[in-house]
């Protein structure tokens, strides 16, 4: 995990939304322990900036996470909004893009 991130901001609402898609809090947190790609999501950012992260869980499954970063005093916490396992087309695209980056 990025040393600037102090931890995760969980409550029953965001845990439930992630569980609805079959992704546990542990799987989501494990994605942030590994290399990930993060993209801003200006279309869905209302009031606070949302991001999309794609990466692999500790189990090796490809995960898409929608999250925001929340400041508390001088620390930043990741607040997952939703997460799901990526579809086959998304995995293929992710793997192709990752291969291009590795060749650089």
Regions found by a protein language model. Give the residues of each.
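Ribonuclease/tRNase effector modules and their secretory precursors
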Residues: 1-104
């Amino acid at each position: 995990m990025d040393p600037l991130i102090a931890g995760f901001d969980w409550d029953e609402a965001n845990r439930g939304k992630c569980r609805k898609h079959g992704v546990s809090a542990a799987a989501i947190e494990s994605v942030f322990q590994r290399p990930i790609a993060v993209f801003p999501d200006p279309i869905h950012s209302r009031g606070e900036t949302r991001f999309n992260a794609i990466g692999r869980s500790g189990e090796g499954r490809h995960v898409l996470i929608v999250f925001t970063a929340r400041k508390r005093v001088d620390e930043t916490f990741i607040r997952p909004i939703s997460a799901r396992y990526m579809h086959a087309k998304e995995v293929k695209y992710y793997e192709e893009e990752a291969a291009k980056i590795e060749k650089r």
